[in-house]
Amino acid sequence: MSKRSEKLAETIHETISSILSRGLNDPRIGFVTLTAVDVVEDLSIARIYFTAIGDRDARKNSEAGLNSAKGYLRRELGKVLTIRHIPELIFKYDESQEYGNRIDSILREIATEHDRDDSEHS
C-alpha cells in the first residue's frame, strides 16, 4: 500500500470504529470490532475486516447490518475525508482470530498428550 492509501485506511478505521462505538440503529449489528482496513491503490475500494461476538448467525447478521449501513457510513466518511470520491466499502468477517484460536487449541492438545506420554514413561 502507498502512504496515501495507508493514511486513508487509518482514517477510515478510526472513523468507522468511532461510529460503531456510538452505535448504529440496526439491531442486527452486535458487538463488532474492526481489525483492519485495506484500501486499494486507486483509493476506490476499502475492505474493512471485522470480528463479532457470537455464533455464525450472529456474525452473518452483523455483516448484513454493516452492509446495509454502507450508505450512511460513506456519508459520515465524506464529512471527515478530504478526497473527492469516498471509497466503496466492503465488509469482510476476519477469520484470522478463529484460525489462531484453532491452532492454539491444537498446540495445547499436543502439549497435553506429550506431557501424558512423558509421565507414562517415567
UniProtKB/Swiss-Prot annotation:
Recorded hits in PANTHER family, A to Z, give: RIBOSOME-BINDING FACTOR A, CHLOROPLASTIC-RELATED
A GO MF term = ribosomal small subunit binding
Keywords for this protein: Cytoplasm, Ribosome biogenesis
| Function text | One of several proteins that assist in the late maturation steps of the functional core of the 30S ribosomal subunit. Associates with free 30S ribosomal subunits (but not with 30S subunits that are part of 70S ribosomes or polysomes). Required for efficient processing of 16S rRNA. May interact with the 5'-terminal helix region of 16S rRNA.
Which family is this sequence assigned to? Belongs to the RbfA family.
Compartments in which it is found: Cytoplasm
Name of the protein this chain belongs to = Ribosome-binding factor A
Tell me the subunit arrangement. Monomer. Binds 30S ribosomal subunits, but not 50S ribosomal subunits or 70S ribosomes.
State the HAMAP family in the record: RbfA
Keyword Cytoplasm in the entry? The reply is yes
Which organism encodes this protein? Answer: Pelobacter propionicus (strain DSM 2379 / NBRC 103807 / OttBd1)
